[in-house]
Amino acid sequence: MSRTDDPGVAGLRVYIVGGAVRDDLLGLPAGDRDWVVVGATPEDMARRGFIPVGGDFPVFLHPRTKEEYALARTERKSGRGYKGFTFYTGADVTLEQDLQRRDLTVNAIARTPQGELVDPLDGVADVRARVLRHVGEAFAEDPVRILRLGRFAARFGDFSIAPETMQLCRRMVEAGEADALVPERVWKEVSRGLMAQAPSRMLDVLARAGALARVMPELHDDTAVRAEIDRAAAAGLPLAGRYALLCRHTPERDALGRRLRAPVECMDQARLLPLAVDALAASATPAAQLDLIERCDALRKPERFDALLQAAAIVAPVDLSAWRARVQAVRAIDAGAIARQCAGDPARIKPALRQARLQALGGA
């Protein structure tokens, strides 16, 4: 993590902050590094060739490494929701003040380029104790932090949540802060939580805080849902499959997807999975197999169908190899050749094509 030999930051007080420091302490692979710069101005950064990319506050890309460098800042609540903040980034803002505005103590640890930790909020102790604890009462000013807490609980399955932090989340929800969350931010955190190692913990945190019913009121949440999304995580399923399993017991899954503004792929999987699970249980005959293949548009979208089968396999056993062979057998039928054989009698094309596909499935 050394920056001692980087001429781009020579003379600047720079620190690695946040997740990179936390994950290093946990012995996890290093991800993207975020840097905070103390005592500098935007003009100082521009003179060094740093590229401004921040909107609400000054953030810059290193001209060579493209890592993010943010000027140390404080923030003050000035309105409702996660956008209701006023930021101050003067050169007099200290590192400790910047760390104080962060969400959790485990994310409020800094490291110098020489490797020395700066830990005014005892985040290292909470990393060692495996505790997610809010930094201070300012946590309550940003409702996104409830979602982030759920996501971190899902990612770090052996971490507990400090009781006072959960109490604060409940007070935030009761005060209506969660109602100010916009769909894009909810989806961003929920989707990342679904891709973590224990997605059910995210649902647990949001439910205990009272936020789940506010941000996903349509969702039917029970022990079966939680068990299935955790099995999906263990199996390494992609996001669309995990989301489909999350929604499998939710009658209003389309409304939920629209509320979250979930991607089309996720909404398609959520819509098709219940059909597939039911059809797979009754697909002993070629006719039933062909009906499922056609209803799921597997001939045009075989990769999506394969992903759908993998999600269905979380619910009940599925012979993936056999189904892949069936799709391949049906796709091998030359529809053009059949159409030519039926020249002069177009009405025969559809039944002839179906019969050929059924015969292919009988031998698949």
Curated annotation (Swiss-Prot):
Function: Catalyzes the addition and repair of the essential 3'-terminal CCA sequence in tRNAs without using a nucleic acid template. Adds these three nucleotides in the order of C, C, and A to the tRNA nucleotide-73, using CTP and ATP as substrates and producing inorganic pyrophosphate. tRNA 3'-terminal CCA addition is required both for tRNA processing and repair. Also involved in tRNA surveillance by mediating tandem CCA addition to generate a CCACCA at the 3' terminus of unstable tRNAs. While stable tRNAs receive only 3'-terminal CCA, unstable tRNAs are marked with CCACCA and rapidly degraded.
Gene Ontology molecular-function annotations: ATP binding; CCA tRNA nucleotidyltransferase activity; magnesium ion binding; tRNA binding
Name of the protein this chain belongs to: CCA-adding enzyme
InterPro entries: CCA_bact (IPR012006), NT_sf (IPR043519), PolA_pol_head_dom (IPR002646), PolyA_RNA-bd (IPR032828), tRNA_CCA-adding_enzyme (IPR050124)
EC number: 2.7.7.72
Keyword field: ATP-binding, Magnesium, Metal-binding, Nucleotide-binding, Nucleotidyltransferase, RNA repair, RNA-binding, Transferase, tRNA processing
Binding site for Mg(2+): 32, 34
Catalytic reaction annotation: a tRNA precursor + 2 CTP + ATP = a tRNA with a 3' CCA end + 3 diphosphate; a tRNA with a 3' CCA end + 2 CTP + ATP = a tRNA with a 3' CCACCA end + 3 diphosphate
GO biological process: RNA repair; tRNA 3'-terminal CCA addition
Misc. remarks from the entry: A single active site specifically recognizes both ATP and CTP and is responsible for their addition.
Organism: Bordetella pertussis (strain Tohama I / ATCC BAA-589 / NCTC 13251)
Residue sites binding CTP per the record: 19, 22, 102, 148, 151
NCBIfam families associated with the record: PRK13297.1
Chain residues that bind ATP: 19, 22, 102, 148, 151
Record-stated family: Belongs to the tRNA nucleotidyltransferase/poly(A) polymerase family. Bacterial CCA-adding enzyme type 2 subfamily.
Required cofactor names: Mg(2+)
HAMAP family in UniProt: CCA_bact_type2 (MF_01262)
